[in-house]
Amino acid sequence: MARIAGVDLPRNKRVAIGLTYIYGIGHSKAEEIVEQTGVSTDTRVKDLTEDEVNRLRSTIDNDYTVEGDLRREISMNIKRLMEIGCYRGLRHRRGLPVRGQSTKNNARTRKGPKRTVGAKR
């Protein structure tokens, strides 16, 4: 089983599909990586040679931000927005939608379950 960036790739899938199991690599980036390294697109992960795995590993390590580093970078960006006190940071802090969606009726995913405020008389 090929292990790249701390992730075990599924053995029976094609290489490009297997690479998408790594956080930060989607379909288009996976195709790009396979093309850069010269690995055949039809190759299954279990059929990769050690040399091909090393080429994939080095390409991903050198050219892309993936897994823990990417998660850390994203959380640091959000933390920075919250610290400087900009509008987006305030929305993150309050747990409300950040990108301008209306919150009068929906936004339940971001706001959480309903909390009844008080009965009107």
Swiss-Prot record:
Residues 107-121 have a biased composition (Basic residues). Keywords: Ribonucleoprotein, Ribosomal protein, RNA-binding, rRNA-binding, tRNA-binding. InterPro entries: Rbsml_uS13_C (IPR027437), Ribosomal_uS13 (IPR001892), Ribosomal_uS13-like_H2TH (IPR010979), Ribosomal_uS13_bac-type (IPR019980), Ribosomal_uS13_CS (IPR018269). One of its GO terms (biological process) is translation. It comes from the Bacteria. GO terms for cellular component: cytosol; small ribosomal subunit. Residues 94-121 are annotated as: Disordered. PROSITE patterns: RIBOSOMAL_S13_1, RIBOSOMAL_S13_2. One of its GO terms (molecular function) is tRNA binding. It holds the Pfam family Ribosomal_S13. Located at the top of the head of the 30S subunit, it contacts several helices of the 16S rRNA. In the 70S ribosome it contacts the 23S rRNA (bridge B1a) and protein L5 of the 50S subunit (bridge B1b), connecting the 2 subunits; these bridges are implicated in subunit movement. Contacts the tRNAs in the A and P-sites. Belongs to the universal ribosomal protein uS13 family. Part of the 30S ribosomal subunit. Forms a loose heterodimer with protein S19. Forms two bridges to the 50S subunit in the 70S ribosome. This is Small ribosomal subunit protein uS13. The gene is rpsM.
